């Protein structure tokens, strides 16, 4: 139903419309803004100026995402709206399940794409005040020119219009990246990946620069010998190093790190519950490694020790190579055994953990710093209770070599929404230097998620604009506008040291 149709509904009493209530309702509607107006989130003149004259003009530097490299290499032309919008989007899947949608209409293999899309369209009206409501409508507008409110009634028309536009070159993968002026993408890649798709991307005419990111989470799986050993077999084959002991294991990982570097990678990433507050000698690490290779699962204490040992190793090789390390800390993953067995991992059944973060993280950063082996590092918390912990941790080990060497990352995952981003921006502002912040990333598997950069930029300009209007920040366009441009793009461009496209 269109917005006009929604406005025509008038409250009734006993089945009859009260004239007084008609007048009252019409007055109420006349004072309401249109949904998603041009100045969405921009409530002051300064906010509008900062956004339209500074933020919106910046290209995108997407330094962390989960976009599939094969689809970039092949310049995929999506078959329909479900494929580009819903396939793989666990944010939407989670909302659909909460809305009572059966799993067959969420991830079912024997259900048509249209039926799953229609189930999502029926869910959208129930996502009011969830960021999915804003993101979904922004995506429809920015990519397809569809201003309709999506619901059960408008779904067929939206499906038809979107699918027609998806057949055009402008909405191929390369077209989408060009339209959004995405200058850099850093994907998320396993060390055993052959990176063939990244090699293929370099041979295309795509202006966006696409780099792999080294994500060695499986190197810590000593509590899962079957998975650990299967992965080491792949590591052995890919590195041509026979992994028989801890030393050869580290050599094989360094070999893959070097290979990633040769293809332009300058960023690593780790997803952990926390950095353990333990110590581990090389002898202890060897014992734990050998036991896992022999099929004996490590105890929780041993997992913590091995994690500490390996994370120091990864930090040192990142520092030696001039890379940036990312630490995503605090998730409890795959919390639904039923869906894990049926659908697999990473399907929208993860949540925020309450793990101790402060001591292990600060000791880790300090240890590497004391060895002169601390790389540039971006830390992300998932539990908002840790905002001030992380915002203060970054200040302990700044060494004066580059601005903002240790970064408090943008609101991650469940915090990637209006309130969560405001919390992160405010914590960083109060306890660090917001002006040196490297800004937003999509962290997404969807090519139409670049509206999240728009969302972040509008929110940032809203917050800073209000401060200017209230006399908390000087009304200096060069000073404030420059800060906005830096946060939205230029800081990341300078920080990560990657060659960028020129979109």
Residue ranges and their predicted role:
Residues 331, 336:
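Hard-cation-handling environments
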């Amino acid at each position: 139903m269109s917005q006009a149709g929604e406005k025509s509904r008038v409250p009734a009493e006993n089945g009859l419309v009260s004239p007084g209530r008609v007048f009252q309702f019409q007055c109420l509607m006349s004072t309401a803004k249109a949904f998603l107006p041009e100045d969405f989130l921009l409530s002051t003149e300064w906010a509008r100026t900062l956004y339209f004259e500074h933020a919106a003009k910046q290209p995108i530097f997407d330094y962390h995402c989960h976009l599939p490299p094969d689809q970039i290499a092949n310049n995929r032309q999506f078959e329909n709206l479900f494929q580009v919008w819903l396939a793989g989007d666990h944010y939407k899947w989670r909302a659909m399940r909460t809305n009572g949608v059966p799993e067959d209409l969420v991830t079912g293999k024997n259900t048509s794409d249209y039926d799953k899309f229609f189930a999502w369209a029926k869910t959208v009206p129930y996502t009011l005040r969830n960021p999915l409501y804003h993101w979904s409508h922004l995506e429809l507008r920015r990519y397809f020119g569809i201003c309709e409110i999506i619901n059960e009634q408008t779904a067929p028309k939206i499906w038809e219009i979107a699918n027609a536009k998806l057949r055009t070159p402008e909405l191929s993968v390369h077209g989408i990246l060009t339209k959004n002026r995405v200058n850099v993408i850093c994907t998320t890649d396993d060390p055993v990946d052959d990176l063939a798709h990244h090699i293929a991307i370099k041979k295309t005419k795509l202006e966006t620069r696409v780099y792999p990111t080294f994500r060695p989470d499986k190197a810590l799986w000593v509590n899962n010998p079957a998975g650990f050993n299967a992965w080491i077999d792949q590591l052995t084959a890919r590195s041509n190093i026979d992994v028989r002991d801890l030393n050869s294991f580290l050599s094989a990982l360094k070999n893959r790190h070097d290979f990633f570097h040769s293809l332009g990678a300058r960023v690593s990433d780790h997803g952990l519950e926390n950095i353990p507050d333990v110590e581990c000698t090389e002898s202890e690490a060897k014992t734990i490694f050998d036991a896992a290779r022999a099929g004996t699962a490590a105890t929780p204490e041993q997992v913590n020790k091995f994690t500490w040992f390996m994370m120091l190793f990864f930090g040192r090789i990142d520092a030696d190579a001039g890379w940036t390390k990312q630490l995503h800390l605090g998730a409890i993953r795959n919390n639904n055994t039923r869906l894990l067995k049926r659908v697999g991992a990473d399907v929208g059944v993860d949540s925020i953990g309450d793990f101790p973060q402060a001591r292990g993280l600060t000791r880790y950063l300090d240890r590497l710093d004391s060895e002169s082996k601390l790389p540039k590092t971006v830390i992300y918390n998932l539990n908002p209770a840790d905002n001030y912990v992380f915002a203060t941790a970054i200040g302990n080990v700044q060494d004066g070599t580059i601005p903002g060497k240790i970064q408090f990352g943008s609101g991650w995952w469940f915090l990637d929404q209006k309130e969560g981003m405001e919390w992160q921006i405010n914590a960083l502002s109060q306890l660090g230097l917001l002006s040196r912040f490297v800004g937003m990333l999509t962290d997404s598997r969807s090519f139409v998620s670049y509206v999240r950069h728009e969302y972040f930029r509008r929110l940032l300009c809203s917050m800073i604009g209000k401060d200017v209007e209230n006399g908390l920040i000087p009304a200096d366009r060069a000073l404030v506008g420059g800060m906005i441009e830096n946060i939205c793009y230029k800081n990341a461009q300078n920080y990560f040291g990657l060659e960028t496209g020129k979109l």
